[in-house]
């Protein structure tokens, strides 16, 4: 039950990831063999629930890629359910301050360190109580990544970084750029300056900085600055653009849509 993703971050080894939004265990397994260090199962913006997260965790399990799960909100009940089906690494969205970061950490810990309910007899995480001393070992293997996506969160970053149990801080470029008045343009110089400053600040505090960016040049820049978990693409985008390119080679034209951030 060792969390190798958490161990890699602690050791300072950069981890390259891919975002999963297709909500499919079949495509999750396909991508688990592609060579990425981690795969993000998105419960915030993709149509996932606990059951679909479970099947994707099962599909990814035989492969080296490590799953990271994003719940729809910083909700202790939802987090409890995700942990029970086997999630060890969480990316908690829209964390605004230290209190909210502390709540996220407490939701992943059994008492007295936290508030996670004990249901190990029903839980895949404990292999239905077949893992010896699961209740004693589980807390140490939880990896909590909090997501900062607003100017308010950026202002509170020093206090968030002081929260014990926060392993990493993920910068959400799409929401941050929108909050800064540059919706759809995370490459705006002011947004980029804020992102770069945050990456350096997070790393200097001994935490792991993370981000999602499909621009290869920017991804490499963030890695140079010290980012440790960087998602470099999204499965839905890869599929859509590849399909459009194939159709275009035979004279077809995709339905006109406004380009997205990723």
UniProtKB/Swiss-Prot annotation:
Site (Transition state stabilizer): 70
Annotated GO CC locations: cytoplasm
InterPro entries xref list: Aldolase/citrate-lyase_domain, HKHD_aldolase_ent, HpaI, HpcH-HpaI_aldolase, Pyrv/PenolPyrv_kinase-like_dom, Pyrv_kinase-like_dom_sf
Pathway: Aromatic compound metabolism; 4-hydroxyphenylacetate degradation; pyruvate and succinate semialdehyde from 4-hydroxyphenylacetate: step 7/7
Enzyme Commission (EC) number: 4.1.2.52
Binding site for a divalent metal cation: 149, 175
GO molecular function: 4-hydroxy-2-ketopimelate aldolase activity; metal ion binding
One of the GO BP terms on file: 4-hydroxyphenylacetate catabolic process
Annotated keywords: Aromatic hydrocarbons catabolism, Lyase, Metal-binding
Cited Gene3D superfamilies: Phosphoenolpyruvate-binding domains (3.20.20.60)
Catalytic activity: 4-hydroxy-2-oxoheptanedioate = succinate semialdehyde + pyruvate
Positions in coiled-coil regions: none
Top EC class, one word: lyase
Residue sites binding substrate per the record: 147, 174-175
Pfam families given in the database record: HpcH_HpaI (PF03328)
Site location (Increases basicity of active site His): 84
UniProt remark on cofactor binding: Binds 1 divalent metal cation per subunit.
Cofactor(s) of this protein: a divalent metal cation
Enzyme active site: 45
Domain of life of the organism encoding this protein: Bacteria
UniProt similarity note: Belongs to the HpcH/HpaI aldolase family.
UniProt subunit comment: Homohexamer; trimer of dimers.
HAMAP family: HKHD_aldolase
The protein's role, per its UniProt record: Catalyzes the reversible retro-aldol cleavage of 4-hydroxy-2-ketoheptane-1,7-dioate (HKHD) to pyruvate and succinic semialdehyde.
Family annotation (PANTHER family): 2-KETO-3-DEOXY-L-RHAMNONATE ALDOLASE (PTHR30502), PHOSPHOENOLPYRUVATE CARBOXYLASE FAMILY PROTEIN (PTHR30502:SF0)
Protein name: 4-hydroxy-2-oxo-heptane-1,7-dioate aldolase
Gene designation per UniProt: hpcH
């Amino acid at each position: 039950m060792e969390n190798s993703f958490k161990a890699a971050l602690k050791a300072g080894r950069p981890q390259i990831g891919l975002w999963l939004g297709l909500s499919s265990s079949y495509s999750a397994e396909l991508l688990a063999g592609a060579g990425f260090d981690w795969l993000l199962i998105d419960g915030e913006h993709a149509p996932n629930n606990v059951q679909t997260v479970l099947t994707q965790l099962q599909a990814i399990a035989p492969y080296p890629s490590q799953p990271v799960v994003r719940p729809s909100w910083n909700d202790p009940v939802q987090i409890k359910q995700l942990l029970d089906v086997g999630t060890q690494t969480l990316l908690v969205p829209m964390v605004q301050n230290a209190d909210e970061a502390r709540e996220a950490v407490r939701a992943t810990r059994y008492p007295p360190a936290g508030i996670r309910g004990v249901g190990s007899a029903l839980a895949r995480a404990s292999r239905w109580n077949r893992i010896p001393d699961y209740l004693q070992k589980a807390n140490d293997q939880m990896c909590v990544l909090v997501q900062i996506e607003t100017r308010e969160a950026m202002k509170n970053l020093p206090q968030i970084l002081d929260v014990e149990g926060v392993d990493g801080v993920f910068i959400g470029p799409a929401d941050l750029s929108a909050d800064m008045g540059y919706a759809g343009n995370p490459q705006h110089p002011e947004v980029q300056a804020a992102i770069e400053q945050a990456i350096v600040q997070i790393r200097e505090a001994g935490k792991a900085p993370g981000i999602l960016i499909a621009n290869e040049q920017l991804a490499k820049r963030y890695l140079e600055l010290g980012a440790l978990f960087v998602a470099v693409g999204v499965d839905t985008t890869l599929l859509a653009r590849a399909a459009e390119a194939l159709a275009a080679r035979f004279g077809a034209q995709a339905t006109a849509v406004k380009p997205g951030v990723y």
